[in-house]
Amino acid sequence: MERIKELRNLMSQSRTREILTRTTVDHMAIIKKYTSGRQEKNPSLRMKWMMAMKYPITADKKITEMIPERNEQGQTLWSKVNDAGSDRVMISPLAVTWWNRNGPVANTIHYPKIYKTYFEKVERLKHGTFGPVHFRNQVKIRRRVDINPGHADLSAKEAQDVIMEVVFPNEVGARILTSESQLTITKEKKEELQNCKISPLMVAYMLERELVRKTRFLPVAGGTSSVYIEVLHLTQGTCWEQMYTPGGEVRNDDVDQSLIIAARNIVRRAAVSADPLASLLEMCHSTQIGGTRMVDILRQNPTEEQAVGICKAAMGLRISSSFSFGGFTFKRTSGSSVKREEEVLTGNLQALKLTVHEGYEEFTMVGKRATAILKKATRRLIQLIVSGRDEQSIVEAIVVAMVFSQEDCMVKAVRGDLNFVNRANQRLNPMHQLLRHFQKDAKVLFLNWGIEHIDNVMGMIGILPDMTPSTEMSMRGVRVSKMGVDEYSNAERVVVSIDRFLRVRDQRGNVLLSPEEVSETQGTEKLTITYSSSLMWEINGPESVLINTYQWIIRNWETVKIQWSQNPTMLYNKMEFEPFQSLVPKAIRGQYSGFVRTLFQQMRDVLGTFDTTQIIKLLPFAAAPPKQSRMQFSSLTVNVRGSGMRILVRGNSPVFNYNKTTKRLTILGKDAGTLTEDPDEGTAGVESAVLRGFLILGKEDRRYGPALSINELSNLAKGEKANVLIGQGDVVLVMKRKRDSSILTDSQTATKRIRMAIN
């Protein structure tokens, strides 16, 4: 206080003021400090000092031709004195005002296009709704979040090439635009930015915002999609939160959300097929999300959800080195362990073979609604510090950690038999058996765990087996904390391997992901997901399977027909018939298959019994492993619309109806397409017309390769011979004529010769 009084006293004397404002600074150290290097040492002071001068700005000489010397008020706008050390002129801040009011107006058409991300942000905020502010403790955890709404998902390198191509098309340098998205964006932007006068550097900077995902490691308590992160400073503080609903969605959030749904559906479906890995790859390659190929999105999108991780691993991409258990992401932060097999007995005396991790390790566990720090030794939980949004979330985390610890008291808490199976009806591995058991009911586990007296530690509280908080007692080793545990910040990606059953392992053989870890949560995708793979026909229910199966046969009828007559086994094993089997009652599948296969064989053997409609109708039933029996069927049952419906072996039914006159097929009353070939016409019509220009030589001759369809005959060279499949399922040998003169007579001869060749 004394010092301040003294200073005030000094400043009131005019001499003091004069010394401070007038004397030159001549101390070398001070001069050095403020003049060495190009870096401004005190920017704010410099700015204030410059703006106090009359002409603080320098500009190119030609500005004097564009701006008057004085404004309307008669104030000078620029000095006739040149800037020291350059040939620029000194200008008053008033000149800027004059320019803004009276200067030339450029074409503004490009502004919304260049500053698209800003314009869109304003719209989102305008239409967003801010709710009440609540004061409460915020459990924030640092997560890697997307801070840039509305971006495409190009890698930095890809974006750089696009930007160079759009902004500096004539610059030298190799630019390879390969991906679909790169080419589309480049074309779009070049058109948008024709005759754009905005500085190229600004355009490049704004394009980068639009093309590349920018992530930061930020403390978040609520939503993590980019439209929430852009208002993070408005929605959560240290002790308050404000409710907010965004005024619009952005494609990048929609892509992330839809990708997770597609990946989950695909992994769930692949897990129950005969070859999970092959099926998964087939589905990833044939699926589109919002019109973009799923594999392209997987290559660029950094989302770290379990199902997405499995799909990436299958494609040979690197994924995060953390592993998943019970829906929590575990990251080992210290310690190490070795694995060994050990047999343990449950409380029900059931033997389980556990892979035990020996050694001291520490982990962070991060889930959707709870996080924890776990310290464990061999089959022993030393400490677990949990924080979560609500009691339920905390329970989930504790159960997962207790099972993960592999403690004996946990194994002994099992009541009843463990026989959980996955979607493919295979038994789960022991760790997941235990997990499922206690996720259903953790009462016994918590009661058997044991309790201990606790010390009073700031920010931590005990928790009892019935989940009531306590300051005196707690379950052994378990504490609840007010603070969240940060997600693992390091975004390192590691090379992984994946086995046939979709278990993903790191190079040390630790399982990081498996189908058991994929969430069962169902959601509605924001973008349209188009699954072209037959494996996904089931996703829209039994009717869709039925219609899709028959449509597939009709679309591919030409090749199906040849396989039907030449290589039926290969045809029956086609994966396109796999979904259909789920519609056929399990007990009778084999008999149906045996019956249909025998029927087909008779059609192949007995002339004139080939019937297109009937083959199409019955073909899917022949795909199941056949049981030999003498049973005959007049109708076959399929389970659709919640009950068994009948398909008549001969004739139409509501399930399968073929109209001979219109040649239209309707399945369950829905149009399923046209059959190209009418089964009941004699050979003469279609074949003789098509076989003009060919000579029929006789019966099939295997030396000339597999039978061609009539459409494929056009590829033959003159004089070349081939087997050809004709309407009634018969195969004959033909030769393409060397001359065209006798084509007219061919159609009559063809009819006769076909009959002879066959008989």
UniProtKB/Swiss-Prot annotation:
Gene name in the database record: PB2
SUPFAM superfamilies listed in its UniProt record: PB2 C-terminal domain-like
Pfam families: Flu_PB2_1st, Flu_PB2_2nd, Flu_PB2_3rd, Flu_PB2_4th, Flu_PB2_5th, Flu_PB2_6th, Flu_PB2_7th
Site feature location: Mammalian adaptation: 627
Alphabetical list of Gene3D superfamilies matching this protein: Polymerase Basic Protein 2, C-terminal domain
Organism the protein comes from: Influenza A virus (strain A/USA:Texas/UR06-0195/2007 H1N1)
Function in brief: Plays an essential role in transcription initiation and cap-stealing mechanism, in which cellular capped pre-mRNAs are used to generate primers for viral transcription. Recognizes and binds the 7-methylguanosine-containing cap of the target pre-RNA which is subsequently cleaved after 10-13 nucleotides by the viral protein PA. Plays a role in the initiation of the viral genome replication and modulates the activity of the ribonucleoprotein (RNP) complex.
Database matches in HAMAP family: INV_PB2 (MF_04062)
Keywords, sorted A to Z: Cap snatching, Eukaryotic host gene expression shutoff by virus, Eukaryotic host transcription shutoff by virus, Host gene expression shutoff by virus, Host mitochondrion, Host nucleus, Host-virus interaction, Inhibition of host innate immune response by virus, Inhibition of host MAVS by virus, Inhibition of host RLR pathway by virus, Inhibition of host RNA polymerase II by virus, mRNA capping, mRNA processing, Viral immunoevasion, Viral transcription, Virion
Domain of life: Viruses
UniProt-recorded name of the protein: Polymerase basic protein 2
Any Gene Ontology biological process: DNA-templated transcription
InterPro entries: Flu_PB2_2nd, Flu_PB2_6th, Flu_PB2_C, Flu_PB2_CAP-bd, Flu_PB2_middle, Flu_PB2_N, INV_PB2, PB2_helical
Assembly description: Influenza RNA polymerase is composed of three subunits: PB1, PB2 and PA. Interacts (via N-terminus) with PB1 (via C-terminus). Interacts with nucleoprotein NP (via N-terminus). Interacts (via N-terminus) with host MAVS (via N-terminus); this interaction inhibits host innate immune response.
GO cellular component, one term: virion component
